[in-house]
Amino acid sequence: MAKQIGIDLGSANTLVYLKDEGVILSTPTVIAIDKNTGKDLCFGAPAKKMLGKTPDTIKVSKPVREGVIADMDDTTLFITRLLEKTELTSFFSRPDAYVCIPCKATEVERRAVQTAIYDAGTKNVSLVAEPLAAAVGAGCKVLSAKGRMIVDIGEGTTETAVISLGDIVVSRSQKIAGATLDRAIMNYFHNERRIEIGELTAERLKIKIGVAHPKINRGEYRVIGRNLNNGMVIASVATSKEIYYAIRPALLSIVHQIRLTLEATPPELTSDICNNGIILTGGGALLPGIADYVSAELGVKVAVAPKPLESVCIGIGKMLESDGELAKILNKDI
């Protein structure tokens, strides 16, 4: 019998779940390729460290952007190396793969994921709606008639969905997420400080001192960038309050999406959500104060999942390990 794996193919990180073993790998969705030979040099964390630092002969690719495949060849190569590292593929063995995708992905985007994963060395490829997997991984009773709302704030997209009786009732997807916050920080330094900083520096600022409320103080962080006035290297200090004001417009957009989803939700399910609250998953859920921020804006209880970064992958795993109704979700058309 073929092995069964779950794959959370994210814009920032890719996680792999192996049935009967759990999450066996989590690595950045980045691959470095030699332009002259077309061969890959490394992938994951080593490749991510090369972003913005390579000569013209090396391409560092982030093949998944805004939740979908941006470069088919690079994605296939990345997944191939990923599966080789986990020793899940061989000439005699190809695993069955269950892959999460945004609920609003187009037919073309879905086929691209299936093709890339199959070409990387899997046998059968099935697609699973990302918010549904996130809800299961967050511990929600998705088979219940009571409505639950899940907000998965990833790197490339924010998925908002209302779930009841094992399926998605209402959903929205927008391309304002973790990467948007990074760009907002870069733009803030460009416009307000006249300092150019890189993508990794912006991400580091978000992680180290980013907040979703101005009253939360996470201190300061030293930044090194390029002075746009004279082109020289400059060292500066950023505060958590500055980062908040830089990312606040993006946070408001995420709240607006949640509000629109609530407005489109049937009244009985809205009542359930008011009683049960909203669950946040994804890397964006780790931003200090975001649950309180969303709750204050919407007037609804909001909580962060126990393991927000792994919720989607854990959710696929729970479905794979289940012998009951939960397992049937894996085979639903989405």
Go through each PLM region and give its residues.
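Nucleotide/phosphate-binding catalytic cleft detector across ATP-hydrolyzing
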Residues: 1-155, 161-278, 285-334
